[in-house]
Amino acid sequence: MGKPGGAKTRTAVCLSDGVFFLAGAFMSLTLVWSYFSIFSPSFTSLRHDGKPVQCSGLDMQFDPSEPGFYDDPDLSYSIEKPITKWDEKRNQWFESHPSFKPGSENRIVMVTGSQSSPCKNPIGDHLLLRCFKNKVDYARIHGHDIFYSNSLLHPKMNSYWAKLPVVKAAMLAHPEAEWIWWVDSDAIFTDMEFKPPLHRYRQHNLVVHGWPNIIYEKQSWTALNAGVFLIRNCQWSMDLIDTWKSMGPVSPDYKKWGPIQRSIFKDKLFPESDDQTALIYLLYKHKELYYPKIYLEAEYYLQGYWIGVFGDFANVTERYLEMEREDDTLRRRHAEKVSERYGAFREERFLKGEFGGRGSRRRAFITHFTGCQPCSGDHNPSYDGDTCWNEMIRALNFADNQVMRVYGYVHSDLSKTSPLQPLPFDYPNEAW
Protein backbone atom coordinates (compact mmCIF):
# COMPACT_ATOMS: atom_id res chain seq x y z
CA MET A 1 0.00 0.00 0.00
CA GLY A 2 1.43 3.29 -0.88
CA LYS A 3 2.03 5.97 1.69
CA PRO A 4 -0.36 8.93 1.68
CA GLY A 5 2.50 11.36 2.11
CA GLY A 6 4.33 10.01 -0.95
CA ALA A 7 1.29 10.50 -3.19
CA LYS A 8 0.92 14.10 -2.00
CA THR A 9 4.55 14.89 -2.81
CA ARG A 10 4.22 13.62 -6.41
CA THR A 11 1.06 15.74 -6.94
CA ALA A 12 2.82 18.87 -5.70
CA VAL A 13 5.74 18.24 -8.03
CA CYS A 14 3.38 17.81 -11.03
CA LEU A 15 1.52 21.02 -10.16
CA SER A 16 4.78 22.89 -9.81
CA ASP A 17 5.98 21.66 -13.21
CA GLY A 18 2.63 22.62 -14.76
CA VAL A 19 2.83 26.15 -13.38
CA PHE A 20 6.31 26.61 -14.82
CA PHE A 21 5.15 25.23 -18.20
CA LEU A 22 2.15 27.55 -18.38
CA ALA A 23 4.25 30.53 -17.33
CA GLY A 24 6.78 29.76 -20.05
CA ALA A 25 4.08 29.33 -22.68
CA PHE A 26 2.49 32.63 -21.68
CA MET A 27 5.82 34.45 -21.94
CA SER A 28 6.43 32.92 -25.38
CA LEU A 29 3.03 34.02 -26.65
CA THR A 30 3.60 37.50 -25.22
CA LEU A 31 6.91 37.79 -27.07
CA VAL A 32 5.38 36.58 -30.34
CA TRP A 33 2.46 39.01 -29.99
CA SER A 34 4.84 41.88 -29.23
CA TYR A 35 6.97 41.01 -32.26
CA PHE A 36 4.02 41.10 -34.63
CA SER A 37 2.67 44.28 -33.03
CA ILE A 38 5.97 46.01 -33.81
CA PHE A 39 6.79 44.59 -37.20
CA SER A 40 3.45 43.68 -38.81
CA PRO A 41 1.75 46.29 -41.04
CA SER A 42 -1.44 47.89 -39.82
CA PHE A 43 -4.51 47.33 -41.96
CA THR A 44 -6.37 50.34 -40.66
CA SER A 45 -6.26 54.03 -41.40
CA LEU A 46 -7.69 56.98 -39.50
CA ARG A 47 -10.92 58.71 -40.42
CA HIS A 48 -11.20 62.46 -40.32
CA ASP A 49 -12.52 62.19 -36.76
CA GLY A 50 -9.54 60.09 -35.65
CA LYS A 51 -11.42 56.78 -35.51
CA PRO A 52 -9.86 53.80 -37.31
CA VAL A 53 -11.24 52.64 -40.64
CA GLN A 54 -10.75 49.11 -41.87
CA CYS A 55 -9.13 49.20 -45.31
CA SER A 56 -10.98 46.09 -46.40
CA GLY A 57 -14.15 48.01 -47.31
CA LEU A 58 -15.79 51.34 -47.94
CA ASP A 59 -17.10 53.22 -44.93
CA MET A 60 -20.44 54.37 -46.31
CA GLN A 61 -21.82 55.46 -42.93
CA PHE A 62 -19.19 58.11 -42.28
CA ASP A 63 -19.37 61.72 -43.44
CA PRO A 64 -17.49 64.33 -41.37
CA SER A 65 -19.48 67.12 -39.78
CA GLU A 66 -16.91 69.73 -40.81
CA PRO A 67 -18.02 71.80 -43.84
CA GLY A 68 -16.90 70.60 -47.26
CA PHE A 69 -17.55 71.66 -50.84
CA TYR A 70 -21.07 70.21 -50.70
CA ASP A 71 -21.87 72.82 -48.03
CA ASP A 72 -20.99 75.70 -50.35
CA PRO A 73 -24.27 77.33 -51.51
CA ASP A 74 -22.51 78.60 -54.64
CA LEU A 75 -21.76 75.07 -55.85
CA SER A 76 -24.30 74.31 -58.57
CA TYR A 77 -25.18 71.05 -60.28
CA SER A 78 -26.72 73.01 -63.15
CA ILE A 79 -25.21 72.69 -66.61
CA GLU A 80 -25.37 76.49 -66.87
CA LYS A 81 -22.96 77.23 -64.02
CA PRO A 82 -19.28 76.21 -64.34
CA ILE A 83 -17.43 74.23 -61.68
CA THR A 84 -13.99 75.44 -60.62
CA LYS A 85 -11.15 73.77 -58.67
CA TRP A 86 -12.84 70.38 -58.97
CA ASP A 87 -9.56 68.46 -58.65
CA GLU A 88 -8.85 70.18 -55.32
CA LYS A 89 -12.39 69.54 -54.14
CA ARG A 90 -12.15 65.84 -54.98
CA ASN A 91 -8.79 65.54 -53.22
CA GLN A 92 -10.24 67.18 -50.11
CA TRP A 93 -13.16 64.76 -50.23
CA PHE A 94 -10.78 61.77 -50.36
CA GLU A 95 -8.79 63.18 -47.43
CA SER A 96 -11.93 63.28 -45.31
CA HIS A 97 -13.18 59.90 -46.63
CA PRO A 98 -9.97 57.78 -46.64
CA SER A 99 -11.72 54.43 -47.01
CA PHE A 100 -12.57 55.39 -50.61
CA LYS A 101 -8.95 55.97 -51.66
CA PRO A 102 -7.88 52.36 -52.35
CA GLY A 103 -8.80 51.41 -55.91
CA SER A 104 -10.18 54.84 -56.75
CA GLU A 105 -8.07 55.18 -59.91
CA ASN A 106 -10.16 52.46 -61.61
CA ARG A 107 -13.53 53.19 -60.05
CA ILE A 108 -16.34 53.64 -62.58
CA VAL A 109 -19.92 54.87 -62.34
CA MET A 110 -22.01 53.93 -65.36
CA VAL A 111 -24.67 56.45 -66.40
CA THR A 112 -27.51 55.94 -68.84
CA GLY A 113 -31.05 57.17 -69.35
CA SER A 114 -34.13 57.52 -71.49
CA GLN A 115 -37.19 59.73 -71.95
CA SER A 116 -39.61 60.48 -69.12
CA SER A 117 -42.80 59.49 -70.94
CA PRO A 118 -44.07 56.11 -72.22
CA CYS A 119 -42.78 54.98 -75.60
CA LYS A 120 -44.90 55.37 -78.73
CA ASN A 121 -43.51 52.15 -80.17
CA PRO A 122 -45.57 49.26 -78.67
CA ILE A 123 -42.41 47.25 -78.00
CA GLY A 124 -40.33 50.28 -77.03
CA ASP A 125 -40.69 50.20 -73.24
CA HIS A 126 -39.93 46.47 -73.21
CA LEU A 127 -36.78 46.98 -75.27
CA LEU A 128 -35.59 49.85 -73.08
CA LEU A 129 -36.19 47.78 -69.95
CA ARG A 130 -34.16 44.93 -71.37
CA CYS A 131 -31.42 47.30 -72.50
CA PHE A 132 -31.25 48.65 -68.95
CA LYS A 133 -31.14 45.12 -67.51
CA ASN A 134 -28.22 44.44 -69.84
CA LYS A 135 -26.30 47.40 -68.39
CA VAL A 136 -27.19 46.43 -64.82
CA ASP A 137 -25.89 42.91 -65.50
CA TYR A 138 -22.59 44.19 -66.86
CA ALA A 139 -22.19 46.68 -63.99
CA ARG A 140 -22.96 44.03 -61.36
CA ILE A 141 -20.48 41.52 -62.82
CA HIS A 142 -17.69 44.11 -62.83
CA GLY A 143 -18.50 45.93 -59.61
CA HIS A 144 -19.59 49.26 -61.08
CA ASP A 145 -22.27 51.52 -59.66
CA ILE A 146 -24.94 52.53 -62.16
CA PHE A 147 -27.26 55.54 -62.38
CA TYR A 148 -30.32 55.71 -64.62
CA SER A 149 -31.96 59.03 -65.47
CA ASN A 150 -35.39 59.29 -67.07
CA SER A 151 -35.82 63.03 -66.55
CA LEU A 152 -34.43 66.11 -68.22
CA LEU A 153 -32.08 67.97 -65.88
CA HIS A 154 -32.46 71.10 -67.99
CA PRO A 155 -35.61 71.91 -69.99
CA LYS A 156 -33.66 73.06 -73.04
CA MET A 157 -31.07 70.28 -73.05
CA ASN A 158 -33.19 67.54 -74.57
CA SER A 159 -32.70 64.76 -77.11
CA TYR A 160 -29.01 63.92 -77.62
CA TRP A 161 -27.94 66.93 -75.52
CA ALA A 162 -29.68 65.56 -72.40
CA LYS A 163 -26.65 63.45 -71.48
CA LEU A 164 -24.36 66.39 -70.63
CA PRO A 165 -26.34 67.69 -67.60
CA VAL A 166 -26.63 64.11 -66.31
CA VAL A 167 -22.91 63.41 -66.73
CA LYS A 168 -21.97 66.63 -64.93
CA ALA A 169 -24.37 65.89 -62.06
CA ALA A 170 -22.97 62.35 -61.79
CA MET A 171 -19.42 63.70 -61.55
CA LEU A 172 -20.45 65.92 -58.64
CA ALA A 173 -22.49 63.20 -56.94
CA HIS A 174 -19.67 60.65 -57.22
CA PRO A 175 -16.32 62.22 -56.29
CA GLU A 176 -15.16 58.70 -55.35
CA ALA A 177 -15.31 57.64 -59.03
CA GLU A 178 -12.43 58.32 -61.40
CA TRP A 179 -14.52 57.65 -64.51
CA ILE A 180 -18.09 58.37 -65.53
CA TRP A 181 -19.16 55.99 -68.28
CA TRP A 182 -22.03 57.24 -70.40
CA VAL A 183 -23.85 54.52 -72.40
CA ASP A 184 -26.83 55.37 -74.65
CA SER A 185 -30.08 53.55 -73.93
CA ASP A 186 -29.93 51.72 -77.29
CA ALA A 187 -26.35 50.51 -76.80
CA ILE A 188 -26.09 46.87 -75.68
CA PHE A 189 -23.14 45.14 -74.02
CA THR A 190 -22.52 42.05 -76.15
CA ASP A 191 -19.30 40.93 -74.46
CA MET A 192 -19.97 40.66 -70.75
CA GLU A 193 -16.38 39.59 -69.98
CA PHE A 194 -14.43 42.38 -71.65
CA LYS A 195 -13.18 45.32 -69.59
CA PRO A 196 -11.98 48.64 -71.07
CA PRO A 197 -8.17 48.78 -70.78
CA LEU A 198 -8.06 51.74 -68.41
CA HIS A 199 -4.26 51.57 -68.18
CA ARG A 200 -4.18 52.60 -71.84
CA TYR A 201 -5.97 55.84 -71.00
CA ARG A 202 -3.75 57.02 -68.13
CA GLN A 203 -2.79 60.22 -69.98
CA HIS A 204 -6.28 60.88 -71.37
CA ASN A 205 -9.48 62.32 -69.96
CA LEU A 206 -12.06 61.29 -72.57
CA VAL A 207 -12.32 57.97 -74.39
CA VAL A 208 -14.65 57.70 -77.38
CA HIS A 209 -14.87 55.36 -80.36
CA GLY A 210 -13.45 57.12 -83.43
CA TRP A 211 -10.77 57.64 -86.05
CA PRO A 212 -8.41 60.65 -86.33
CA ASN A 213 -8.05 60.43 -90.11
CA ILE A 214 -11.81 60.72 -90.62
CA ILE A 215 -11.83 63.88 -88.51
CA TYR A 216 -8.81 65.63 -90.00
CA GLU A 217 -8.78 64.30 -93.56
CA LYS A 218 -12.38 63.51 -94.44
CA GLN A 219 -14.16 65.95 -92.09
CA SER A 220 -17.05 63.56 -91.48
CA TRP A 221 -19.61 63.85 -88.71
CA THR A 222 -19.35 60.05 -88.27
CA ALA A 223 -15.65 60.29 -87.33
CA LEU A 224 -16.63 59.36 -83.79
CA ASN A 225 -19.75 58.29 -81.92
CA ALA A 226 -20.70 60.22 -78.79
CA GLY A 227 -23.26 57.65 -77.67
CA VAL A 228 -20.73 55.78 -75.53
CA PHE A 229 -17.81 57.44 -73.78
CA LEU A 230 -15.65 57.34 -70.67
CA ILE A 231 -14.91 60.74 -69.15
CA ARG A 232 -12.49 61.28 -66.29
CA ASN A 233 -13.90 62.95 -63.21
CA CYS A 234 -11.59 65.97 -63.21
CA GLN A 235 -11.48 69.73 -63.83
CA TRP A 236 -10.40 69.26 -67.46
CA SER A 237 -13.63 67.35 -68.09
CA MET A 238 -15.71 69.96 -66.30
CA ASP A 239 -14.20 72.59 -68.59
CA LEU A 240 -14.84 70.41 -71.65
CA ILE A 241 -18.51 69.99 -70.73
CA ASP A 242 -18.81 73.74 -70.23
CA THR A 243 -17.38 74.39 -73.71
CA TRP A 244 -19.24 71.47 -75.31
CA LYS A 245 -22.65 72.63 -74.06
CA SER A 246 -22.00 76.13 -75.46
CA MET A 247 -22.99 74.69 -78.86
CA GLY A 248 -26.17 73.21 -77.40
CA PRO A 249 -29.73 74.51 -76.85
CA VAL A 250 -28.77 76.16 -73.56
CA SER A 251 -26.58 78.61 -75.47
CA PRO A 252 -27.98 81.86 -76.93
CA ASP A 253 -25.85 81.10 -80.01
CA TYR A 254 -27.34 77.63 -80.52
CA LYS A 255 -28.99 78.39 -83.88
CA LYS A 256 -25.76 79.54 -85.49
CA TRP A 257 -23.84 76.37 -84.65
CA GLY A 258 -25.79 74.03 -86.94
CA PRO A 259 -24.81 75.92 -90.13
CA ILE A 260 -21.22 76.29 -88.91
CA GLN A 261 -20.94 72.54 -88.31
CA ARG A 262 -22.49 71.69 -91.68
CA SER A 263 -20.12 74.06 -93.46
CA ILE A 264 -17.21 71.87 -92.31
CA PHE A 265 -18.78 68.42 -92.02
CA LYS A 266 -20.67 68.20 -95.29
CA ASP A 267 -22.26 64.80 -94.57
CA LYS A 268 -23.96 65.96 -91.37
CA LEU A 269 -27.62 64.93 -91.55
CA PHE A 270 -29.26 67.25 -89.03
CA PRO A 271 -29.53 70.99 -89.67
CA GLU A 272 -29.34 71.82 -85.95
CA SER A 273 -26.23 71.52 -83.80
CA ASP A 274 -25.83 68.09 -82.18
CA ASP A 275 -23.53 66.85 -79.43
CA GLN A 276 -21.54 64.49 -81.66
CA THR A 277 -20.68 67.02 -84.35
CA ALA A 278 -19.96 69.58 -81.63
CA LEU A 279 -17.31 67.30 -80.12
CA ILE A 280 -15.80 66.62 -83.53
CA TYR A 281 -15.76 70.37 -84.17
CA LEU A 282 -13.73 70.95 -81.00
CA LEU A 283 -11.24 68.28 -82.03
CA TYR A 284 -11.02 69.66 -85.55
CA LYS A 285 -10.77 73.36 -84.72
CA HIS A 286 -8.77 73.10 -81.49
CA LYS A 287 -6.64 70.03 -82.06
CA GLU A 288 -3.73 71.24 -79.93
CA LEU A 289 -6.05 71.74 -76.96
CA TYR A 290 -8.24 68.63 -77.09
CA TYR A 291 -6.59 65.90 -79.15
CA PRO A 292 -3.79 65.17 -76.61
CA LYS A 293 -6.39 64.39 -73.95
CA ILE A 294 -9.05 62.61 -76.02
CA TYR A 295 -8.39 58.96 -76.87
CA LEU A 296 -10.05 57.89 -80.11
CA GLU A 297 -10.46 54.15 -79.55
CA ALA A 298 -10.66 51.94 -82.63
CA GLU A 299 -8.93 48.73 -81.51
CA TYR A 300 -12.14 47.22 -80.16
CA TYR A 301 -15.86 47.98 -80.40
CA LEU A 302 -16.30 50.53 -77.62
CA GLN A 303 -19.44 50.92 -79.64
CA GLY A 304 -20.01 48.91 -82.81
CA TYR A 305 -22.58 49.89 -85.41
CA TRP A 306 -25.16 47.10 -85.26
CA ILE A 307 -25.40 46.59 -89.02
CA GLY A 308 -21.81 45.36 -89.02
CA VAL A 309 -22.24 43.13 -85.97
CA PHE A 310 -25.58 41.34 -85.77
CA GLY A 311 -24.99 38.79 -88.54
CA ASP A 312 -21.97 37.34 -86.73
CA PHE A 313 -23.61 36.20 -83.48
CA ALA A 314 -23.74 32.51 -84.48
CA ASN A 315 -20.14 32.42 -85.71
CA VAL A 316 -18.70 34.21 -82.70
CA THR A 317 -20.68 31.95 -80.35
CA GLU A 318 -19.10 28.91 -81.98
CA ARG A 319 -15.62 30.45 -81.73
CA TYR A 320 -16.05 30.96 -77.99
CA LEU A 321 -17.41 27.43 -77.53
CA GLU A 322 -14.32 26.11 -79.31
CA MET A 323 -12.15 27.88 -76.74
CA GLU A 324 -14.15 26.24 -73.97
CA ARG A 325 -13.86 22.79 -75.52
CA GLU A 326 -10.11 23.27 -75.73
CA ASP A 327 -9.61 24.32 -72.11
CA ASP A 328 -11.75 22.93 -69.30
CA THR A 329 -10.97 25.94 -67.07
CA LEU A 330 -13.53 27.90 -69.08
CA ARG A 331 -16.11 25.12 -68.64
CA ARG A 332 -15.79 25.10 -64.87
CA ARG A 333 -18.85 26.19 -62.94
CA HIS A 334 -18.22 29.19 -60.71
CA ALA A 335 -19.90 31.94 -58.71
CA GLU A 336 -20.84 35.10 -60.56
CA LYS A 337 -18.71 37.15 -58.14
CA VAL A 338 -15.54 35.59 -59.56
CA SER A 339 -16.53 35.80 -63.23
CA GLU A 340 -13.76 38.31 -63.91
CA ARG A 341 -11.20 35.60 -63.16
CA TYR A 342 -12.50 33.49 -66.06
CA GLY A 343 -12.75 36.45 -68.40
CA ALA A 344 -9.12 37.30 -67.64
CA PHE A 345 -8.13 33.67 -68.24
CA ARG A 346 -9.82 33.62 -71.67
CA GLU A 347 -8.17 36.94 -72.52
CA GLU A 348 -4.69 35.64 -71.67
CA ARG A 349 -5.14 32.14 -73.11
CA PHE A 350 -6.98 32.87 -76.35
CA LEU A 351 -7.47 36.56 -77.11
CA LYS A 352 -4.27 38.35 -76.11
CA GLY A 353 -3.22 40.71 -78.91
CA GLU A 354 -6.47 40.11 -80.80
CA PHE A 355 -7.99 43.37 -82.01
CA GLY A 356 -11.74 43.77 -82.01
CA GLY A 357 -13.81 44.59 -85.05
CA ARG A 358 -15.42 42.72 -87.91
CA GLY A 359 -13.83 39.33 -88.56
CA SER A 360 -12.14 39.30 -85.16
CA ARG A 361 -12.33 36.29 -82.85
CA ARG A 362 -13.60 38.70 -80.20
CA ARG A 363 -17.21 39.41 -79.50
CA ALA A 364 -18.20 43.01 -80.17
CA PHE A 365 -17.93 44.74 -76.80
CA ILE A 366 -20.91 47.09 -77.25
CA THR A 367 -23.39 46.86 -80.11
CA HIS A 368 -25.05 50.22 -80.73
CA PHE A 369 -28.42 50.24 -82.46
CA THR A 370 -27.89 53.70 -83.90
CA GLY A 371 -30.81 54.89 -86.02
CA CYS A 372 -33.27 52.33 -84.64
CA GLN A 373 -35.09 54.68 -82.23
CA PRO A 374 -36.71 51.83 -80.25
CA CYS A 375 -38.87 54.17 -78.16
CA SER A 376 -40.42 56.31 -80.87
CA GLY A 377 -40.27 53.57 -83.49
CA ASP A 378 -39.18 56.12 -86.11
CA HIS A 379 -36.18 54.15 -87.28
CA ASN A 380 -34.01 54.99 -90.24
CA PRO A 381 -36.19 54.30 -93.32
CA SER A 382 -33.36 52.31 -94.90
CA TYR A 383 -33.88 49.58 -92.27
CA ASP A 384 -36.44 46.97 -93.31
CA GLY A 385 -39.62 46.52 -91.29
CA ASP A 386 -39.02 45.12 -87.81
CA THR A 387 -35.34 44.36 -88.40
CA CYS A 388 -34.27 46.76 -85.64
CA TRP A 389 -36.49 45.23 -82.95
CA ASN A 390 -35.77 41.63 -83.96
CA GLU A 391 -32.01 42.18 -83.97
CA MET A 392 -32.10 44.05 -80.68
CA ILE A 393 -33.81 41.02 -79.12
CA ARG A 394 -31.19 38.69 -80.61
CA ALA A 395 -28.37 40.91 -79.33
CA LEU A 396 -29.93 41.06 -75.86
CA ASN A 397 -30.36 37.28 -75.72
CA PHE A 398 -26.81 36.80 -77.03
CA ALA A 399 -25.55 38.91 -74.12
CA ASP A 400 -27.97 37.32 -71.66
CA ASN A 401 -26.56 33.88 -72.47
CA GLN A 402 -23.22 35.02 -71.07
CA VAL A 403 -24.95 36.15 -67.87
CA MET A 404 -27.41 33.29 -67.41
CA ARG A 405 -24.83 30.59 -68.04
CA VAL A 406 -23.49 31.20 -64.52
CA TYR A 407 -27.04 30.55 -63.30
CA GLY A 408 -27.19 27.28 -65.24
CA TYR A 409 -29.37 28.32 -68.19
CA VAL A 410 -29.10 29.76 -71.71
CA HIS A 411 -31.31 30.80 -74.62
CA SER A 412 -31.10 27.94 -77.12
CA ASP A 413 -32.69 30.22 -79.74
CA LEU A 414 -31.56 33.87 -79.75
CA SER A 415 -34.87 34.99 -81.23
CA LYS A 416 -36.80 33.65 -78.20
CA THR A 417 -36.42 35.31 -74.81
CA SER A 418 -38.23 32.64 -72.80
CA PRO A 419 -38.13 29.86 -71.67
CA LEU A 420 -34.45 29.15 -71.10
CA GLN A 421 -32.72 25.80 -71.51
CA PRO A 422 -30.91 24.19 -68.54
CA LEU A 423 -27.26 23.41 -69.22
CA PRO A 424 -25.71 19.97 -68.72
CA PHE A 425 -22.60 19.59 -66.57
CA ASP A 426 -19.31 20.29 -68.41
CA TYR A 427 -21.04 22.13 -71.25
CA PRO A 428 -20.08 22.50 -74.11
CA ASN A 429 -18.11 19.23 -73.89
CA GLU A 430 -21.35 17.59 -72.84
CA ALA A 431 -23.89 18.45 -75.55
CA TRP A 432 -27.59 19.10 -74.93
UniProtKB/Swiss-Prot annotation:
One Pfam assignment: Glyco_transf_34
Transmembrane stretches, start-end: 19-39
One Gene Ontology term of the molecular function aspect: galactosyltransferase activity
The EC number(s) this enzyme carries: 2.4.-.-
Matching InterPro entries: Glyco_trans_34 (IPR008630), Nucleotide-diphossugar_trans (IPR029044)
Intervals, Lumenal compartment: 40-432
Cellular component, GO annotation: endosome; Golgi apparatus; Golgi membrane; trans-Golgi network
Keywords tagged on the record: Glycoprotein, Glycosyltransferase, Golgi apparatus, Membrane, Signal-anchor, Transferase, Transmembrane, Transmembrane helix
Protein topology in the membrane: Single-pass type II membrane protein
Ranges per topology, Cytoplasmic: 1-18
Chief subcellular location: Golgi
Protein function: Probable glycosyltransferase that may be involved in the biosynthesis of xyloglucan.
Family assignment from sequence similarity: Belongs to the glycosyltransferase 34 family.
Protein name stated in the entry: Glycosyltransferase 6
Gene: GT6
